[in-house]
């Protein structure tokens, strides 16, 4: 592509020349840097293959294998040229044709050989997490692996002073990690149903105690349904049945209270009426005594008047005289 771009301004415009240029397969040529660029950066292809943040001490059969690579660290080096990317990709495919099917051991060797391919590095990250978890329980197992020393060194200086916080600082587990490490990733967080069931399970004994009897009776149905969100159906039914029982009990108590109040009122009225009847009876007896007294008096007056009339019967003014 770079060759086509560089040849663009110098191409002739005749059809024969264009057909001659099109006969060439330019894609089979490797893209290389200019000699000036190579003179400015000698030995860069050897160090360009090394990924940022990695250490390498064992060379492989690379074009630069004649000069052993020393441990170097290049975290801030940036790849700004497209030609370097093409050159690295083609060079890695020539040296490692089975890059897509690497095992963790091959990934370790590829990492030591300074080949920046993302997929083998991901496999190596999973292998590194499993190995470091094994190293946490057994202090000296890393001598059995050829690249375990590099894998352990890549954890950084924070692995040794914070060894007791290993599980918090370890990389996220992958398919090669233990099931105990995969448990937090398989369950990222409780859903709404899990939260509701956990709330209901945590308050099984206190669901009915959450609301007092007065609150259940005085609360409206809409407000009660809003407070009962998150509880199970059985608990809601049981709480509503308790509310219905309390309302029926309250209604029965109010009816009983009304009946008692009415009974007391009737008893008071009865007592008052009885007292009035007694007063009336006393009045009747008093009137009867007065009547008897007046009757006796009238009889006495009548008897005394008849005697006076009998004494004067001989006179012409008496009534018997005219008869």
Swiss-Prot record:
Residues 266-287 are annotated as: Leucine-zipper. Residues 54-76, 192-201 have a biased composition (Low complexity). There is a cross-link at residues 32, 297 (Glycyl lysine isopeptide (Lys-Gly) (interchain with G-Cter in SUMO)). The keyword Transmembrane does not apply. Sumoylated. Sumoylation on Lys-32 and Lys-297 stimulates its transcriptional repression activity and promotes macrophage differentiation from myeloid progenitors. One of its GO terms (cellular component) is nucleus. Its main location: nucleus. Acts as a transcriptional activator or repressor. Plays a pivotal role in regulating lineage-specific hematopoiesis by repressing ETS1-mediated transcription of erythroid-specific genes in myeloid cells. Required for monocytic, macrophage, osteoclast, podocyte and islet beta cell differentiation. Involved in renal tubule survival and F4/80 maturation. Activates the insulin and glucagon promoters. Together with PAX6, transactivates weakly the glucagon gene promoter through the G1 element. SUMO modification controls its transcriptional activity and ability to specify macrophage fate. The leucine-zipper domain is involved in the interaction with LRPICD. This is Transcription factor MafB.
């Amino acid at each position: 592509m770079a060759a086509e771009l560089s040849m663009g301004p110098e191409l002739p415009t005749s059809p024969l020349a264009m057909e001659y240029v099109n006969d060439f397969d330019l894609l089979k040529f490797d893209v290389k840097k200019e000699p000036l660029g190579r003179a400015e950066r000698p030995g860069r292809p050897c160090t360009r293959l090394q990924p940022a943040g990695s250490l390498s001490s064992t060379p492989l059969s690379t074009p630069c294998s004649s000069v052993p690579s020393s441990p170097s660290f290049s975290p801030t080096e940036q790849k700004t040229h497209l030609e370097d990317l093409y050159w690295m990709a083609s060079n890695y495919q020539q040296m490692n044709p089975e890059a897509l099917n690497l095992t963790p051991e091959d990934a370790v060797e590829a990492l030591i050989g300074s080949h920046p391919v993302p997929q083998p590095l991901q496999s190596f990250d999973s292998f590194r997490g499993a190995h470091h978890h094994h190293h946490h329980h057994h202090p000296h197992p890393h001598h059995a692996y050829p690249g375990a020393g590099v894998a352990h060194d890549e954890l950084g200086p924070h692995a040794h002073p914070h060894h007791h916080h290993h599980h918090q600082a370890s990389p996220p587990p992958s398919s090669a990690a233990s099931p105990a490490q995969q448990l937090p990733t398989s369950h990222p967080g409780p859903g709404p149903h899990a939260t509701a069931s956990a709330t209901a399970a945590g308050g099984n004994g206190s669901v009915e105690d959450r609301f007092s009897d007065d609150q259940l009776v005085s609360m409206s149905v809409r407000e009660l349904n809003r407070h009962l969100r998150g509880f199970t159906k059985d608990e809601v039914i049981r709480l509503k049945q308790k509310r219905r029982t309390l309302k029926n009990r309250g209604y029965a108590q109010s009816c009983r209270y009304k009946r008692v109040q009415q009974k007391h009122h009737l008893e008071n009225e009865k007592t008052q009426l009885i007292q009035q009847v007694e007063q009336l009876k006393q009045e009747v007896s008093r009137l009867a005594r007065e009547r008897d007294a007046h009757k006796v008096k009238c009889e006495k007056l009548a008897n005394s008047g008849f005697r006076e009339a009998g004494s004067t019967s001989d006179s012409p003014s008496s009534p018997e005289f005219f008869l």
